[in-house]
Amino acid sequence: MSGGGDVNMSGGDRRKGTVKWFDTQKGFGFITPSDGGDDLFVHQSSIRSEGFRSLAAEESVEFDVEVDNSGRPKAIEVSGPDGAPVQGNSGGGGSSGGRGGFGGGGGRGGGRGGGSYGGGYGGRGSGGRGGGGGDNSCFKCGEPGHMARECSQGGGGYSGGGGGGRYGSGGGGGGGGGGLSCYSCGESGHFARDCTSGGAR
């Protein structure tokens, strides 16, 4: 039955089976039919779901079978028992956050964007300057309630700030950047981008 198009082999009766495995990120997996036979390929586009289309391993499902253009059978119209929506993988759309979800927003340290896992993996989620707490805490001193530009702690400047730590642990290290002095004029209390004197050091 190869060639023209997909052919539905169900004959009206839905088949039952169990999910063998399903890769949420890649969007496909395999179902083991209850009545025996080979495992059937299933793509996320064939899943009936009220939200994110995924399947959980060992989940009971019902499905129709269709033969694709290359003659291989695959599961389609996959649902839970009695046509109910599938339970799916509890990880949802981001597979429980995944590496891409770690860290705060972009920019300098991720503090402002706020990620549930804090500084995360450096350049990926948090920007390049040290990660931050992810919960609006200062990336210089680690205390909540203010940003680094408002920090009263000297010695950090914009040169360090630590690694942010994994999962918001605060990290350690950080360099001594010379306090809160302007790089343009050397005066304390403002940064070069806010400098009005225009003088060079």
From Swiss-Prot:
CDD domains: CSP_CDS
Compositionally biased tracts (Gly residues): 89-109
Keyword Nucleus found: yes
UniProt signal peptide: none
One of the Pfam families matching this protein, by short name: zf-CCHC
Biological-process GO terms, alphabetical: embryo development ending in seed dormancy; fruit development; response to cold
Tissue-specific expression: Mostly expressed in shoot apices and siliques, and, to a lower extent, in roots, cotyledons, stems, shoots, leaves, floral buds and flowers. Present in shoot apical meristems and siliques (at protein level). Very low levels are observed in cv. Landsberg erecta compared to cv. Columbia.
Subcellular location: Cytoplasm; Nucleus, Nucleolus; Nucleus
Gene Ontology CC entries for this record: cytosol; nucleolus; nucleus
Residue positions, PTM N-acetylserine: 2
Alphabetical list of SUPFAM superfamilies matching this protein: Nucleic acid-binding proteins, Retrovirus zinc finger-like domains
Region Disordered, annotated ranges: 66-109
Residue intervals of the CSD domain: 14-81
Family, similarity comment: Belongs to the cold shock protein (CSP) family.
Protein's recorded name: Cold shock domain-containing protein 4
Lineage: Eukaryota, Viridiplantae, Streptophyta, Embryophyta, Tracheophyta
